[in-house]
Amino acid sequence: MEKYQSKARFAPLSDAPFALRGALGSSNSSFNNIDHLRQSSSSGQARSYTSSPLGALRPKMFPSGNRLLHTSRPLSAPVANRPLSPHLPLKKPQLSATFSISHRIFGAALGAVIISIPLATKFSLMFDV
């Protein structure tokens, strides 16, 4: 057992938890030792992480001033500099709230008329009206 712990490859893993030994022990892992993992987790900053196929976690590196957005084209300067919030849309809605509500009411009324014509025909033939 001691001949395995004397190898340089397993030296940084002596105090690592068992679950991390496989990810940290690979030669192409992004963490060279367990101290880097402790420093990155104790920094107190919220970071995003990617995972490699081997299970090692690496912090995503974004250029300063840029953020990850799911858009197909570049944003204008005022939109790009505004902080992201889940309750603020990036663009103004195209339809006003009044138009949207009236559209729903008209759709419900039209649906009721379309359904009532076959029902009225069926019941008029059934009761000879």
Curated annotation (Swiss-Prot):
Self-association and partners: Component of complex II composed of eight subunits in plants: four classical SDH subunits SDH1, SDH2, SDH3 and SDH4 (a flavoprotein (FP), an iron-sulfur protein (IP), and a cytochrome b composed of a large and a small subunit.), as well as four subunits unknown in mitochondria from bacteria and heterotrophic eukaryotes.
Protein name, per record: Succinate dehydrogenase subunit 3-2, mitochondrial
Amino-acid positions noted as binding heme in the UniProt annotation, renumbered to this chain: 87
SUPFAM superfamilies in the record: Fumarate reductase respiratory complex transmembrane subunits
GO molecular function: electron transfer activity; metal ion binding
Ranges of compositional bias, category Polar residues: 27-53
UniProt cofactor(s): heme
Keyword Transmembrane helix part of the UniProt annotation: yes
Entry keywords, A to Z: Electron transport, Heme, Iron, Membrane, Metal-binding, Mitochondrion, Mitochondrion inner membrane, Transit peptide, Transmembrane, Transmembrane helix, Transport, Tricarboxylic acid cycle
Transit peptide (first-last residue): 1-58
Subcellular location: Mitochondrion inner membrane
Native source organism of the sequence: Oryza sativa subsp. japonica (Rice)
Region (Disordered): 27-66
Superkingdom in the source lineage: Eukaryota
GO terms, biological process: mitochondrial electron transport, succinate to ubiquinone; tricarboxylic acid cycle
